[in-house]
Amino acid sequence: MAGFMRQLFVCMIGIYGSFLSWAVMQEKIITRPYDGERFSSPALLSLAQSFMTVLCGLLWNWFHGVSARGLLEPKFLGYFSSIAISASLSSYFGYASMFHLSYPTVILGKSCKLLPVIALHVFVYKRKFPPHKYLIVTMITAGVSIFSYFQNTSSKGKHAEHDSPIGLLLLFFNLLMDGITNTTQDKVFGKYKLSSVTMMIAVNLGIACLNGLYLISPFCNQQPLSFINRHPSILKDMLLFACTGSVGQLFIFFTLEKFGSITLVTITLTRKIFTMLLSVFHFHHTVSSIQWLGILLVFLGISLEAGLKILNNNSTAKKKAS
């Protein structure tokens, strides 16, 4: 029992420590100027993150004696390519939204992963969902809307933060691409025997290649290397960002493997809350009383979603046992 609790504690500290540090680095790099100049090359940031994730994934597989040779089989290439493209687009839209939204708004908005999925299925495929899913989406959307609207009306002064409709639209497309990525991954997992870490390696390898090609193409005029030459301190931040994100992914896989999805859902939920609070207090974002109501609505919505998922998993497990 002591060993079990010790492993769980290590997983919790690993996930919290990695992803809270990752979020701080991400917000600093994207939203804070370096000697008066802001970093404007999300592609380089995505390349650093995906390269480090591939490296960590290969080390994980090597440690567990898992071969990655099957990644280049023709039957996987089509799937991996499409996942890499949708994941790269998701990353692009996500980073682009940060130039038009405050970071707390982005964190809250990313909690509403159900919105684009339900919108796509309802309006395109004419599919219906259980009432609780509509309730969850309504609560989270209302919370994000309240927070974003009052971000604009309460922000004043030279360094005021403002959320624009363009930013919210970009965030919607980020979530939509996320949904497409996850759906395709589920299809691959259902069709082939493939570990999550191997999938992570393949997808991030594709993302690294796509971003690398973009950075050396004539379409890229952001000159990220010139920015690094002018502000070399960003290299340390980028390295911390890439390392903490990659290590956090490994802690997630380890937690899922050792303790199951219910424990992981609980840890992920509390991690989102801590990330939001850390952003507000560490970077001194101004949050009004009504905006705290919006935050509360969002976290009530994702708590309801997590609770129902846990209940559903428990009932499924009982049915299998009987």
UniProtKB/Swiss-Prot annotation:
The signal peptide, as residue positions, is none
Membrane topology per the entry is: Multi-pass membrane protein
Q: What is its main location?
A: endoplasmic reticulum
Write out the GO biological process terms: UDP-galactose transmembrane transport; UDP-glucose transmembrane transport into endoplasmic reticulum
Concerning Pfam families, the annotation shows: UAA
- Where in the sequence does glycosylation occur per the annotation? N152, N313, N314
Subcellular compartments: Endoplasmic reticulum membrane
**What are the protein's GO molecular function terms?**
UDP-galactose transmembrane transporter activity; UDP-glucose transmembrane transporter activity
Is Transport one of the keywords? yes
Q: Which UniProt keywords apply?
A: Endoplasmic reticulum, Glycoprotein, Membrane, Sugar transport, Transmembrane, Transmembrane helix, Transport
Give GO cellular component annotations, separated by semicolons: endoplasmic reticulum; endoplasmic reticulum membrane; Golgi membrane
User: Its domain of life?
Assistant: Eukaryota
- Which cysteines bridge via disulfide bonds? none
Q: In which family does this protein belong, per the annotation?
A: Belongs to the nucleotide-sugar transporter family. SLC35B subfamily.
Protein role: May be involved in specific transport of UDP-Gal from the cytosol to the Golgi lumen. Involved in the maintenance of optimal conditions for the folding of secretory pathway proteins in the endoplasmic reticulum.
Entry protein name: UDP-galactose transporter homolog 1
Q: Which organism does this record belong to?
A: Schizosaccharomyces pombe (strain 972 / ATCC 24843) (Fission yeast)
Lineage of producing organism: Eukaryota, Fungi, Dikarya, Ascomycota, Taphrinomycotina
